[in-house]
């Protein structure tokens, strides 16, 4: 996402997977408001805790997303990410609907 990587007040360096980038392009074509996900990315990269409404939680009992977190941008729009606190990097892994991400 343009502009976020250059912000000096970020606690974590932002890294996007190629899959995440392609999923964002798809969501943009679908008319989704990418400002919503950009705001979440900014909060997470600053080390801020997300509001309860985002339902941020660790993914458990999932072999594919071991040690990852997920939050809700909208009721059926998820953001999967991982924070490496030792290296101060936040990885944005995937974004999309429940069926696209969790039920493969």
What is each of the regions a protein language model found here?
Residues 16-43, 47-51:
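N-terminal first-folded block
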Residues 19, 64, 97:
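Residues that form or immediately flank small-molecule/cofactor binding pockets and catalytic motifs
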Residues 39, 60, 103-104:
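Short, intrinsically disordered/low-complexity patches at protein termini
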Residues 45-72:
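A short, surface-exposed loop/turn module that caps and links secondary-structure elements
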């Amino acid at each position: 996402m343009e502009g976020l990587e250059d912000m000096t007040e970020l606690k974590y360096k932002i890294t996007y997977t190629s899959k995440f980038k392609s999923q964002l392009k798809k969501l943009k074509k679908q008319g989704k408001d990418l400002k919503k996900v950009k705001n979440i990315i900014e909060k997470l990269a600053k080390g801020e805790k997300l509001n309860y409404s985002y339902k941020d939680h660790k993914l458990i009992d999932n072999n594919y997303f071991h040690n990852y977190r997920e939050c809700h941008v909208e009721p059926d729009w998820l953001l999967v990410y991982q924070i490496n606190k030792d290296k101060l990097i936040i990885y944005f892994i995937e974004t999309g609907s429940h069926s696209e991400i969790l039920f493969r």
